[in-house]
A protein has these predicted regions:
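Cysteine-dependent hydrolase recognition
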Residues: 1-183
């Protein structure tokens, strides 16, 4: 935080989150997983484990809780995802049929992320590349945070990527989330 006022805002949000928890049960029943299927050679194999990690979380939550997890997954329009990464952390297994194009859209975007957060989700997970100002794909940056109107429906945000929490910057992406007064 760069000032006492900013610190006060964040501390007040934390206190209110604890003191006045969300009472709408739907909030705790919904979540959002965002990820990127990175693949540039168009052979259908993921180059990284981003979407697979998100899908592992999706599977665990879906199989062990009653939370409804919405997916906002993205890949290039010229990519036809067919297999997970064949590398250090995966053996190139085929994607489940429900994640294959055209059944699954693979077109997650900032509008979808904004709408899901504004409607109230308990958590947001993003797994992909990141930078000081936001997430790579689906692309979502600090300017999109200004469009959030979720008020007291504050999700836990798992920004599992590089640089989004680089607090040495003027105002990094994570800091923008924390500082937003009405969401």
């Amino acid at each position: 935080m760069k000032s006492g006022a900013e610190a006060h805002l964040v501390v007040d949000k934390i206190i209110n989150y604890e003191k006045y928890p969300v009472t709408n049960a739907n909030f705790y029943s919904n979540a959002l997983n965002c990820a990127y299927f990175q693949e540039s050679s168009t052979n259908g194999y993921a180059e990284r484990r981003f979407a697979q990690t998100s899908e592992d979380v999706y599977d665990y939550i879906s199989n062990n809780t009653t939370i409804n997890v919405t997916r906002a997954y993205y890949t290039g329009s010229n990519v036809d995802p067919t297999n997970w990464n064949n590398g250090l952390y995966s053996a190139g297994e085929p994607l489940p049929s429900y994640l294959l194009k055209p059944t699954f859209p693979w077109d997650g975007n900032a509008t979808q992320i904004i709408n899901e957060i504004n409607n109230g989700v308990f958590y947001v997970l993003h797994r992909d590349h990141g930078f000081e100002n936001g997430w790579g794909d689906p692309y979502f940056d600090k300017t999109h945070i200004d469009n959030l109107t979720n008020g007291s429906l504050l999700p836990v945000v798992f920004s599992i990527n590089c640089l989004t929490g680089k607090f040495l910057e003027d105002e990094c992406f994570s800091e923008k989330f924390l500082r937003k007064a009405d969401g």
